């Protein structure tokens, strides 16, 4: 929207003696109703805004007269003229643009959109003007004046406790000039402000509560362990009481038998049946034990027989091995004896030949001496194989002794 044309239109409206509606200014009000942006300052378009508001209220009354029925008992009835003067007085008292300017422009440009009755329309306007906060136009934001304004109150320009943003329609809480900067090391809460002493105290209280809770939990755990111990002791005591009760049951049964003979006879019959069942079970247990012992003995006998058979087989194998070794040694001895016998026979032939040659010249006594020597040699030959055979028979007996 062209600001220069708007300012010229506002100046022309102020210069006119007879106030009339301006299409350019109506377009400005429609722009504010749609966007909420006031291009010019409040004092510049304040006069036209009041004129337009008064005209709309009058038109609304002529087109929609006051209700003829009884008024609402929950609402105070105020005449139209009085309500109109009250509204105009509040609006003319503004020194800044109220922050409800967009809604007020909507009511001025299209008054019958939400209201049909005059009294309701006036109450809607009154509700929107009963404010003190202000809004800035775009030009006022860029070129703010040195005056700190509120609607109804003016502050000097050298005031340091208020800024230009403290532009409210009435007394309010101004903002400080400069916000203090806090270091990052200081603790910050969720709103970006440092934690106060109250927050610190609350943190300390929470820590103390957590410590106390942990101590309580430890005490609870100790209590549970002690309860478990007590429960175990109680169970042991209960078992002891049951054992004692079982011991004292026979005495009680005897007393009951003396008191009630019929009951005692029944109890004795039951005891006899239990004894018979116990004896039968004992007999069955004995039979099972005997069968188990017999099976164990049979298994032991079979194991001993198998070990004896294995030992006999091992002995027979050892005997066969020794016999084979003795036979081999006997054959070796026989071969050696045959070789020695052959050598001896050859020697004898040589000696006999020499003897025959010598006997021809020798005496008969020498012949006898040779005959006796030859007989002795033959005896020694016959004895030597016998000794070898005895040694061979003695040799296999040694491994038997070792086994």
From Swiss-Prot:
Assembly information from the UniProt record: Serine/threonine-protein phosphatase 4 (PP4) occurs in different assemblies of the catalytic and one or more regulatory subunits.
InterPro entries (UniProt xref): PPP4R2 (IPR015267)
Domain of life: Eukaryota
Native source species: Xenopus laevis
Protein name: Serine/threonine-protein phosphatase 4 regulatory subunit 2-A
Phylogenetic classification of the source organism: Eukaryota, Metazoa, Chordata, Craniata, Vertebrata
Record-level GO cellular component terms: cytoplasm; nucleus; protein phosphatase 4 complex
Stored PANTHER family: PPP4R2-RELATED PROTEIN, PROTEIN PHOSPHATASE 4 REGULATORY SUBUNIT 2-RELATED
Region (Disordered): 140-403
GO molecular-function term, one example from the UniProt record: protein phosphatase regulator activity
Compositional bias of kind Acidic residues: 388-403
Compositional bias per record (Polar residues), positions renumbered to this chain: 140-149, 156-170, 183-196, 212-226, 371-387
Composition-biased stretches (Basic and acidic residues): 197-211
Function noted in UniProt: Regulatory subunit of serine/threonine-protein phosphatase 4 (PP4).
Family: Belongs to the PPP4R2 family.
